[in-house]
Amino acid sequence: AGKDWAGEENFDPDSKRLLDSACEKGFSLRHDAFGMREYYGQWERNYVKPWIMKRPVLLEGGWIVSKHPYHNDPSGYKTAKDVRIGEFEDGQEAHVNMMDFRVGDETMSWFRDAYPLVERFISEGGYRLYPDSIVVPKEMKSGSRIKIVHRWNNLGWGYCPTNIPQWNQKYKVAFALLNQDNQVVYSYLDNNTDLSVWIKGYPTSYEFTPKLHGVKKGTYTWAVALVDTTKGNGSNVKGLDISAKGTFTNSGWLKLSEVTVK
């Protein structure tokens, strides 16, 4: 009690062991002193590095700009805007999935003093999963095995934490054949997809070869979704949004192209 944790020499020897134990159980990493050079120091930065893209990191700033003497920070903050920039840059370095703007005047400060950073996080932070290339057949025969080639990008600096024990890889890519009413008639799960490894700047490609069991002849529309495998039949219920422009069905499937089954 009463111990000051600021400074690289003051951390408890058990800190890493206890934090590792929590992270291995699926806990996320959260710190409420981003932007504070003493309390979010080199020890904290070094600790978070090996967990980046393995567990979500959540940001909350340390300085309450309306009450705290942030001018004393080693970073040399002069204005509330400087503090917000420092917090944002710390979060960018840690690839945070979420930013906590606190409440009241702290929240207002983000929108009043640093709104461009709010806009940047909306467009750059967290995860934004986008298929930049999908090749599907235009014609196929019922009962045959087909090939679908698809490639995915993450446009955000964070990651999609499908690898945490609580989610247990329950989100996957699935393709569907839609009828004229945009209803899913047949769906195919690509179980080899792992959304947690989709990292910004490193597109991930897959070659999927499902077999068309019992597909009736006719014209359909190909569609793709990031499905929740714990719902529906395991391959037909959209779970996560796709960050793409295009035509989506009411149930969240991104329409691709028409296909004829002979």
Model-derived regions, located:
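Catalytic-core regions of glycoside hydrolase
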Residues: A1-D105
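Extracellular/luminal regions of secreted and cell-surface proteins that mediate adhesion/ECM remodeling
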Residues: I122-K262
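Catalytic cores of secreted or luminal carbohydrate-active enzymes
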Residues: R84-P137
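Arginine residue identity/basic-tract feature
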Residues: R17, R30, R37, R45, ...
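Serine/threonine-rich low-complexity intrinsically disordered regions
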Residues: D12, K49, D73, T79, ...
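Compositionally biased, intrinsically disordered low-complexity regions enriched in proline and serine
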Residues: A6, Y40-G41, V48, H71, ...
